[in-house]
């Protein structure tokens, strides 16, 4: 997705699938800040909101993966103790 910088120029945005958890979280925080600040036109606001939704989903995916890794490590540790 590209966001208009109000000069008719666009900034290229990194695909969300390529972002790690911290980068997704930080960008999501920035999206929320921009939306709460207001003053954006409707189209830009909608684009930001849509990107924020995808960022939030990606953060959840990263967290689910981390939870699974911890669960797997704990299960392996318990299996070694038996």
Swiss-Prot record:
GO terms for biological process: DNA catabolic process. It holds the Pfam family Exonuc_VII_S. InterPro entries: Exonuc_VII_S, Exonuc_VII_ssu_sf. Transmembrane segments: none annotated. GO terms for cellular component: cytosol; exodeoxyribonuclease VII complex. Its main location: cytoplasm. It catalyses: Exonucleolytic cleavage in either 5'- to 3'- or 3'- to 5'-direction to yield nucleoside 5'-phosphates. PANTHER family: EXODEOXYRIBONUCLEASE 7 SMALL SUBUNIT. This is Exodeoxyribonuclease 7 small subunit. It comes from Mycobacterium marinum (strain ATCC BAA-535 / M). The lineage of its organism: Bacteria, Bacillati, Actinomycetota, Actinomycetes, Mycobacteriales.
């Amino acid at each position: 997705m590209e966001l208009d910088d109000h000069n008719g120029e666009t900034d290229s945005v990194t695909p969300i699938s390529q972002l790690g958890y911290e980068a997704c979280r930080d960008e999501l925080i920035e999206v929320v800040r921009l939306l709460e600040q207001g003053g954006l036109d409707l189209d830009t606001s909608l684009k930001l909101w849509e990107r924020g939704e995808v960022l939030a989903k990606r953060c959840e995916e990263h967290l689910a993966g981390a939870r699974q890794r911890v669960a797997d490590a704990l299960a392996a540790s318990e299996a070694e103790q038996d």
